[in-house]
Amino acid sequence: LQMLHAWTNSALVHYAAPDWRETGGRLLGEGALRELRDGRRAASSSWPGRGSSRRWRPGRRTGAAARGCWRAP
């Protein structure tokens, strides 16, 4: 489990690069990219518990990175 955790952290470091939006768009599809684009507006509705954009953005990046790495190993 710790090895998996370290691997996920390295993947997060990779996907949290400055071009993480483009990478996420390629991995998750156009719908997810659109959701990322105007996600700050719909953060409270689609992500309960993450109302503030300051706490919401890193969590959203983590979710995109996790889904991206699992979909394209």
From Swiss-Prot:
Cofactor binding notes: Binds 1 zinc ion per subunit.
GO CC term (a single one): cytoplasm
Gene Ontology molecular-function annotations: aminopeptidase activity; metallopeptidase activity
Keyword terms of this UniProt record: Aminopeptidase, Cytoplasm, Hydrolase, Metalloprotease, Protease, Zinc
Subcellular location: Cytoplasm
Entry cofactors: Zn(2+)
Example GO biological process: proteolysis
Region (Disordered): 39-73
Statement: the UniProt record of this protein carries the keyword Protease: yes
Ranges annotated as biased composition (Low complexity): 42-51, 61-73
EC code(s) of this entry: 3.4.11.-
Predominant location category: cytoplasm
Signal peptide: none
Enzyme class at the top of the EC tree: hydrolase
Function: Hydrolyzes preferentially the N-terminal glycine and can also hydrolyze other amino acids which are used by PepN but is unable to hydrolyze basic amino acids.
Family of the protein in this entry: Belongs to the peptidase M1 family.
Record-given protein name: Aminopeptidase G
